[in-house]
């Protein structure tokens, strides 16, 4: 089944991404996953056994949960993610003050801060 990505939120404290997806049959879900790829709004995705096809390219994705879309939960996810990449307009540098658990920044932001005496 083909899905359209409505919105995506990244959680730097957990490394988990959340995407609101919408089917042609008017079903809205929230996908909780970990991946090295960002699913931008407007992307067309098709689930497969070992990942997801995003705009006709296969990417590995670990899906943790799929739930019915809940607007109250979605608002809470957006307000509490604290990832500067989730904001508009986006800056060039990451201002997240703690260690980011996202392995590859999907927004291409650079980290120029010290955390626990380690450059991140």
Swiss-Prot record:
Domain of life where this protein originates: Bacteria
Presence of the UniProt keyword Cytoplasm in the record: yes
Signal peptide per UniProt: none
Keywords: Cytoplasm, Stress response
Cellular compartments per GO CC: cytoplasm
Keyword Chaperone tagged: no
Cellular compartments annotated: Cytoplasm
InterPro entries on file: Anti-adapter_IraM, PmrD_sf
Entry's Gene Ontology BP terms: cellular response to starvation
Main location: cytoplasm
Family: Belongs to the IraM/RssC family.
Entry function: Involved in the stabilization of the sigma stress factor RpoS.
Protein name in the entry: Anti-adapter protein IraM
The organism of origin for this protein: Salmonella typhimurium (strain LT2 / SGSC1412 / ATCC 700720)
Classification of source organism: Bacteria, Pseudomonadati, Pseudomonadota, Gammaproteobacteria, Enterobacterales
